């Protein structure tokens, strides 16, 4: 019985020892695997901690970048508003400059027309001054003629006065001779009186007739001379009045033309001053437009440079953040 039991127990013990050894081996291998798994878990936990830290950092950076993007968008919107305002102001300035240029062209045309009118007025004034000089010369000639005729009238009046005086003297002489004859007849006798009376009757009528004829002729001549003098004086009075009226008209026309010339010169000066003012204003507007265009170009260059510098989507940091976030998403999906 004992031998049979021993024979039956020995293989069982051997089998049990083999199983123990295999179990020990398995336990050792399991312990080693457990250590490896624990090391892996520790490393994975460390990696996850690092990943979570990197994720938080990436989220912070993403938030900061989002804030910066919002700020940049606001700045861009403000810059766009400023650009729109500056472009509208530049367009207004250009419209005002066009208006000023049109006004300048109009004022130039007005100045040219006023200058042409002033030149024509000056030519008219020169022509009128020449006409006035001619009229003054003719007036002087007429005045000389009038003075000459006045001298002639004075001479005729003197001749009339001398002839009247000579007539009176002749009459007085005739009366004196008659008195002397009558006195001589009264003193002499009757015979001589008869002879003298006969002589007087023969001579005196003839002498009286001749004297009367001469006196009548002289009176007619004097009357004709008086009529001629009156006609000449009236004619030359009318001529002098006409010349004086013409002279007054010429003087008035000359004064009116001088006033017109002064007005045209004043208008020309005003037009020149307005053109100078408009030119200065145009130059100022051109300078302002140039400054605005320079500012706009500078702003555009700055914005382009800042856009190139701050292009968020092409930066390496953004690419790193995107790659880290993709890696985190892959790890979470594997879990």
UniProtKB/Swiss-Prot annotation:
The chain crosses the membrane at residues 312-329. One of its GO terms (cellular component) is nuclear envelope. Keywords: Coiled coil, Membrane, Nucleus, Transmembrane, Transmembrane helix. It is found in: Nucleus inner membrane; Nucleus, Nucleoplasm. It is a single-pass membrane protein. The keyword Transmembrane helix applies. InterPro entries: NEAP1-4. Residues 55-85, 125-260 form a coiled coil. A motif (Bipartite nuclear localization signal) lies at residues 239-260. The keyword Transmembrane applies. It comes from the Eukaryota. Forms homomers and heteromers with NEAP1 and NEAP3. Interacts with SUN1 and SUN2. This is Nuclear envelope-associated protein 2. It comes from Arabidopsis thaliana. The gene is NEAP2.
